[in-house]
Each structure stands twice: as structure tokens, then as C-alpha cells.
């Protein structure tokens, strides 16, 4: 018989830098999960990623206090800010532009995000990422 699911926990943890401090510790502790076991497993799985990039993770906690987790790709907004060399998006995106991204950068981000996007092909994924860039106040060249 399958294990009974107790909870789903959604967190954003920096790749390779999970530790028992907030937000990881309290979120897992209230469900009785072994926090250090999760931290070690998460850090091992994200070892190949660039350290420090926020990585969304969905943790499934079962009634016997065991868990499984699934990592997603880094949010598009973080990748766009990194590509444009800015620290935050515009507070007025339609009037005040804070940076520029080109087609090659958008394609690179779309390839990294394609598994998590619902886009049918790379071109649709590029358009989706370009829309995210515009909503952050970035100029988009070549799309």
C-alpha cells in the first residue's frame, strides 16, 4: 500500500547552501522531518548548480515522517536579473527601464527553464521569458 501523504512544503533554498536555520528548519520541523537528512540530500542534489542561486523545492512529507523532494529550475526573474546585471526589477516597468537583455540571453534562459515551462517549443519559451523580462522593466532586443 502507498504511503499516506501528510503535507507538501514549498520552499526556495539557495543551491548547495541548505542548513537548519530558517526558513528550512521551522518548515520541516513542524512536520517532524529529519532536517539534517533533508539538508544533506538537497545539497548533494544541487551540487552541480551554481552555488547561491535560489532553487524552488517541493517536499512531500509522509505520515511516517519520511519525505521525498523535487527540485525545480531557478526562477526566471533571478536568471533575468543576472543576465541584465541588475539587482532588482523596475518599480515602474512600463515607464522606467532598468536594463536590457538580448535574444541570445533569452534563449539561454529559456533552455534552462524549458522543463518547467508549458511552452510547446523553444520559440514559445523565449516569448514567455521575454514577457517576464518586460514586466520587470527590462528592454528586450531581437524578439
Swiss-Prot record:
Q: Which SMART domains match?
A: RL11
Looking up InterPro entries in the UniProt record yields:
Ribosomal_uL11, Ribosomal_uL11_bac-typ, Ribosomal_uL11_C, Ribosomal_uL11_C_sf, Ribosomal_uL11_CS, Ribosomal_uL11_N, Ribosomal_uL11_N_sf
Domain of life (superkingdom): Bacteria
Q: Which Pfam families match?
A: Ribosomal_L11, Ribosomal_L11_N
Recite the UniProt keywords alphabetically. Methylation, Ribonucleoprotein, Ribosomal protein, RNA-binding, rRNA-binding
One biological process GO term for this chain? translation
What's a single GO CC term here? cytosolic large ribosomal subunit
Q: How is it modified after translation?
A: One or more lysine residues are methylated.
**Gene3D superfamilies, sorted:** Ribosomal protein L11, C-terminal domain, Ribosomal protein L11/L12, N-terminal domain
Q: Which GO terms describe its molecular function?
A: large ribosomal subunit rRNA binding; structural constituent of ribosome
Q: What does this protein do?
A: Forms part of the ribosomal stalk which helps the ribosome interact with GTP-bound translation factors.
Q: Which family does it belong to?
A: Belongs to the universal ribosomal protein uL11 family.
The record's note on quaternary structure and interaction partners says:
Part of the ribosomal stalk of the 50S ribosomal subunit. Interacts with L10 and the large rRNA to form the base of the stalk. L10 forms an elongated spine to which L12 dimers bind in a sequential fashion forming a multimeric L10(L12)X complex.
Name of protein: Large ribosomal subunit protein uL11
The gene name reads: rplK
